[in-house]
A protein has these predicted regions:
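Extracellular and organelle-lumenal recognition/adhesion modules and their flexible linkers in secreted
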Residues: 3-263
Length: 263
């Protein structure tokens, strides 16, 4: 068996070693700049915590419904849904956020809207360096299962500067699937560095023509209803429809890493 004996490993143009080896016991230390701990900015992304209650029925409008904590259901004129913390989940997870249609709406009004969102404080999203020349990309990853196949819209909304960016993902079967959406960096409009709401991550389920009449805004720009949820399937068109979400993760950069489980 061959072996290589070294004291350290250093890049060709580097001044410091990337890996330093202890010659006595063979252990090593590494100079790591992309620390993988505390990278997920979403709170309760695994949907494990539901302190207010595990289920809320008869929902017809915006509210922080019982079910997994930190998530708000927004919208109106979508029919009626039940929200709950479900045990239906992909491998590696125990819970999910479930939306179940109990009164269908197959004929949406122009202002019909149903979305799930979590909002983040400005002091917690400073790593994106938004509004500077060093602005970073946003890597959003999540698991979704739905009995309603079709195109769904996810959005990042900057509350401080009234800006947004949107992307779509396609549910093509009724199984659990992991999705990764990489949103561009934004050199315009910095997030306020305080404990107020600065960034919301939104998942659309229903959208009337007031939100779908333009072209989907896939680059950062001024927030506008008409370009915010274009192509969104009508999840509320049947009482057979269910939508589940878990493993939600938002991190800095162009690569979505494995979900960061926290106790």
């Amino acid at each position: 068996m061959s072996e290589i004996k070294v004291n350290s490993i250093k890049g060709v143009g580097a001044s410091a070693a990337a890996i330093t080896v202890n010659n006595t016991d063979g252990t090593c230390t590494a100079n790591i700049t992309n620390n993988l701990s505390n990278r997920n900015l979403i709170i309760n992304g695994a949907m494990q915590v539901a302190q207010r209650g595990t289920s809320d029925s008869g929902i017809t409008g915006s509210q922080y419904a019982d079910g997994p904590d930190r998530y708000k259901l927004g919208g109106s004129s979508f029919g009626t849904v039940t929200v709950s913390q479900s045990t239906d989940s992909p491998d590696g997870f125990s819970n999910s956020y479930k939306v179940d249609v109990t009164t269908a709406n197959g004929s949406l009004s122009a202002g019909s809207l149903l979305e799930i969102q979590q909002s983040l404080e400005g002091q917690n999203v400073q790593a994106f360096a938004k509004g500077t020349s060093a602005a970073k990309q946003y890597a959003l990853s999540f698991y979704v299962k739905s009995t309603k196949t079709g195109t769904y819209v996810a959005m990042l909304l900057d509350h401080d500067n009234n800006r947004m960016v949107c992307k779509t993902y396609t549910v093509s079967d009724t199984n659990w699937n992991r999705y990764t959406l990489i949103f561009p960096a934004d050199t315009t409009g910095a997030f306020d560095n305080n404990n107020e709401k600065s960034l919301s991550v939104k998942f659309a389920l229903v959208a009337g023509t007031s939100f779908t009449s333009g072209t989907l805004q896939t680059t950062w720009g001024t927030s506008a209803n008409a370009t915010s949820r274009v192509g969104q399937v009508n999840f509320a068109d049947s009482t057979s429809n269910e939508w589940y979400l878990t493993g939600l993760q938002l991190e800095v950069g162009s690569v979505a890493t494995d979900f960061e489980h926290r106790s």
